[in-house]
């Protein structure tokens, strides 16, 4: 068993205009998780985001939605991690993933940023890529020139349902992550 997850980061952009966009699926997951765990987000200026502390049987878990916009997400992650002495390998970052079929989920430790600016900034601020990622598939628009508009728009009703299903499945696996059961959660999340 590895170190359990102590911080869950949902990536997204602040503001009503971004709420239901593909790029905000990390926020979708954290909002649903907070509701299920009866946690309340509070605006924490020193952590550059909305933060909730959840007491779990295996210890406290911090939920954070950076309010810095995607490209500066690492500022919030690093501030909270440093303050509470949370190691990179105890952090889970939940984000949208263009290169995964809509509705599919991938879980991994480390790796590149795949062009995702939120991940790029987190890696730079933590000084390592060795944190966990929960990658929620949103599909690719097919042409690189369309990516920015695609991620900043709302998905179709069909895709929204697939994404919501992947969010709900992911949430069922999170207690395994906070218990440090990474192999088991990987089997669960990667199954159809």
How should these model regions be labeled?
Residues 106-112, 151-154:
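Short glycine-enriched, charge-decorated loop/helix-capping segments at active-site entrances
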Residues 1-110, 120-134, 141-146, 161-192:
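Nucleotide and nucleotide-moiety/phosphate-recognizing core
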Residues 157-158:
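A hydrophobic, small-residue-rich beta->alpha segment in the mid-to-C-terminal subdomain
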Residues 115-118:
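Hydrophobic alpha-helical segments within soluble ligand-binding/sensing domains
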């Amino acid at each position: 068993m590895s170190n359990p997850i102590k911080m869950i980061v949902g990536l997204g952009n602040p503001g009503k205009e971004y709420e239901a966009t593909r790029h905000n699926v990390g926020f979708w997951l954290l909002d649903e998780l907070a509701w299920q765990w009866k946690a309340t987000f509070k605006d924490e200026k020193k952590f550059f985001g909305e933060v909730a502390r959840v007491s779990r049987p295996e210890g406290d878990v911090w939920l954070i939605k950076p309010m810095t916009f995607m490209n500066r997400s690492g500022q919030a992650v690093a501030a909270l991690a440093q303050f509470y002495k949370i190691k990179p390998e105890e952090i889970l970052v939940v984000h949208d993933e263009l290169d995964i079929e809509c509705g599919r989920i991938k879980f991994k430790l480390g790796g590149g940023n795949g062009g995702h600016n939120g991940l790029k900034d987190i890696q730079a601020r933590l000084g390592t890529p060795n944190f966990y990622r929960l990658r929620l598939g949103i599909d690719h628009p097919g042409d690189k020139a369309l990516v920015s508009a695609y991620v900043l728009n709302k998905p179709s009703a069909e895709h929204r349902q697939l994404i919501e299903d992947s969010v709900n499945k992911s949430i069922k696996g999170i207690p395994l992550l906070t218990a440090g059961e990474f192999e088991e959660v990987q089997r669960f999340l990667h199954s159809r």
